[in-house]
């Protein structure tokens, strides 16, 4: 990532560390997915969230050579082959996160410094934000939710394939420049008005049917961040570096401008960061056929 782009990105996402106790979060009991899911139909997760299938096979990962906005950490473009998996159709909402808290006693999604950057009113979640993506969650919060739901965070490669499809494109919807018909972006903080209900942008969905893969909130993925990882990434089912100090954020938040909306954008973040522009979605292995 270029130094200019890196500086802009950090200015967007950096805030005080989110600290606090975490309760044990065991996944709810649930039977195996239906046979329809094994055949490639949409899957409903244990948390009730719809998931879309992403078929096995290769896709081109990383930015094409000569991209006008490409950062160093987005090169080189390389073919990656993934096994079939499922990914949440939508970002995890406040409503679903509330059910997680009720079931586990987990901590609330709150900004560590500025109460004005919260969507929840103390321990209460206003009904008006139930369908908006949860924010003020760090990487460990996201991991705990996905584990509770019987799922996991997507790998960086899984996230990019779900956003990208198998054909060359800059944005989830294709190569048409972003507009407010495609995504929620280029906003300033206005409380709950800043975020849109998940799935609001039909024109912006990905080739596999995932919504908000650009805009609304940045999304945690499983991988540790390494700016040179693409130079040594295995060609099949890459899992990211074995260790690191920062995790990867993908997508783009409500405050970003066009250059960062691209599906190739990689951002590093302290895994303890909680802020008003970061959320997540979950993924799951495909059930055996």
Regions found by a protein language model. Give the residues of each.
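Bacterial N-terminal signal peptides
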Residues: 10-18
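N-terminal pre-domain segments of enzymes
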Residues: 27-44
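Boundary at the C-terminal end of the N-terminal hydrophobic targeting segment
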Residues: 23-25
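Residues embedded in well-ordered beta-strands
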Residues: 52, 79, 170, 219, ...
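Bacterial N-terminal signal peptides that target proteins for export
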Residues: 1-9
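A short glycine-rich, aromatic-capped structural motif
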Residues: 42-114, 137-140, 214-215, 286
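Functional-site microenvironments in short loops/helix caps that host divalent-cation chemistry
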Residues: 60, 64-69, 107, 112-267, ...
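Short, structured beta-strand segments at or near domain termini in extracellular proteins/domains
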Residues: 275-289
């Amino acid at each position: 990532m270029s130094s200019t782009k890196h500086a802009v990105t950090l200015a967007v996402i950096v805030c005080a560390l989110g600290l606090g106790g975490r309760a044990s979060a065991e996944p709810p009991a649930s039977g195996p997915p239906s046979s329809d899911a094994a055949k490639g139909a949409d899957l409903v997760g244990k948390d009730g969230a719809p998931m879309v299938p992403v078929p096995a096979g290769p896709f081109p990962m990383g930015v094409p050579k000569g991209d006008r906005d490409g950062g160093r950490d987005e090169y080189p473009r390389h073919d990656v082959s993934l096994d079939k998996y499922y990914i949440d159709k939508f970002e995890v909402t406040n409503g679903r996160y509330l059910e997680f808290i009720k079931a586990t006693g987990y901590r609330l999604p709150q900004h560590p410094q500025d109460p004005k950057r919260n969507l929840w009113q103390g321990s209460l979640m206003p009904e008006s934000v139930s369908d908006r993506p949860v924010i003020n969650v760090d990487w460990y919060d996201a991991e705990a939710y996905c584990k509770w739901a019987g799922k996991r965070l997507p790998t960086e490669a899984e996230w990019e394939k779900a956003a990208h499809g198998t054909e060359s494109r800059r944005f989830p919807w294709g190569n048409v420049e972003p507009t407010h018909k495609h995504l929620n972006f280029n906003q300033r903080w206005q409380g709950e008005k800043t975020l849109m209900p998940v799935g609001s942008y039909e024109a912006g969905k990905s080739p596999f049917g995932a919504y908000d893969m650009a805009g609304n909130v940045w999304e945690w993925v499983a991988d540790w961040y390494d700016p040179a990882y693409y130079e040594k990434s295995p060609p099949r089912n890459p899992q990211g570096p074995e260790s690191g100090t920062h995790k990867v954020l993908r997508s783009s938040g409500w405050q970003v401008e066009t250059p960062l909306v691209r599906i190739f954008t990689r951002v590093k973040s302290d895994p303890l960061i909680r802020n008003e522009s970061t959320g997540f979605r979950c993924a799951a292995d495909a059930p055996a056929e």
